[in-house]
Structure formats: structure tokens, C-alpha cells
């Protein structure tokens, strides 16, 4: 209920109270927080490159997205797995991330980390159906919005739904 923890204690049986809950998203005991960057200028982004046959049709659109971002950021990286890229966003190592052609298991855990760390996650249209649609945008509030705005003009019709 509103992300609060409720506990029912039976003091009559002298049971100890439960331990305090761990932070929502943590690394080595420290709470994860998305970066505080305010724009894409100087941002470090993560992405994945289309590689399956059914994604190659969208390669030109992807490259247009890439071109529109590479000049205004500090760089674009690929860690090797979408889940790891999303964890980097949650830890503030990346300011934002985008990719398409993913499966639910590629995104679910990392998306939860980003949300727990104070970030935003959506599909390319800004809705919360990224698990169903297989494409994702994630980041801190400012970079997320700027990334979404920058890539949307380059979306093929199949990804605008």
C-alpha cells in the first residue's frame, strides 16, 4: 500500500519485530539513485543494436535515432545486456537507455531497478506497455523526456503503436 511496509506483531508471544526492510534498489548496501543530469548535453547513454532478422528492417530508423543523439551527448555505450544497461541507469552510471526488439525477461528486472531508483520507464510512445511491446526507454526524469522526444520522430510505423 503506497510502498509502505505494514507488520502485525503479537507481543503476547514475545516475538521480536522483523528487521527493517532493505532499500528498494541497492548496490553493496547503498541505495541506487538515477543520475541528476538535467539534459542530454554531456549525458552518457546506453543502447542495444538491432541484430535479429526481424529487427534489420528497422536498422535505418535506429541509425537515425543514433545519429540524432550521438552529437549532443558525451557518448553512447553498450554493456552487453539490456538488463545490465538498465542497472547502469539505476546506478547513475548511464543517464538514459533505449532499445527495441527485446523480450520481457530482458527488461523486467532492470526496469524495476530504474523505477525503484527514481527513474522513468516507458515504451517508445511513452506508455507503460514496454514489456508487451518489446521496446523501452529509461532514464532520470529530464534525460528520459529528452531521449523520448529525440527518438520519436525516427520511429518506424510499427513502433508507433
Where are the language model's segments positioned?
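Generic detector of contiguous secondary-structure segments
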Residues: 25, 31-34
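An extended, acidic
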Residues: 33-161
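DPxDG-like acidic metal-binding loop motif
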Residues: 1-26
Amino acid at each position: 500500500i503506497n510502498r509502505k511496509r505494514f507488520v502485525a506483531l503479537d507481543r503476547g508471544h514475545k516475538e521480536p519485530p522483523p528487521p527493517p526492510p532493505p532499500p528498494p534498489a541497492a548496490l553493496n548496501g547503498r541505495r541506487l539513485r538515477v543520475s541528476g543530469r538535467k539534459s542530454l548535453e554531456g549525458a552518457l547513454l546506453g543502447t542495444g543494436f538491432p541484430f535479429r532478422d526481424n529487427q534489420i528492417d528497422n536498422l535505418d530508423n535506429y541509425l537515425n535515432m543514433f545519429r540524432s543523439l550521438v552529437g549532443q551527448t558525451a557518448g553512447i555505450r553498450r554493456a552487453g545486456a539490456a538488463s545490465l544497461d538498465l542497472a547502469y541507469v539505476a546506478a547513475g552510471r548511464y543517464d538514459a537507455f533505449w532499445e527495441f526488439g527485446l523480450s520481457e525477461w530482458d527488461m523486467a528486472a532492470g526496469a524495476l531497478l530504474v523505477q525503484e531508483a527514481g527513474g522513468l520507464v516507458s515504451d517508445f510512445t511513452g506508455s507503460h506497455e514496454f514489456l508487451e511491446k518489446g521496446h523501452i526507454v529509461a532514464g532520470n526524469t529530464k534525460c528520459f523526456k529528452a531521449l523520448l522526444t529525440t527518438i520519436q520522430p525516427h520511429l518506424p510505423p510499427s513502433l508507433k503503436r
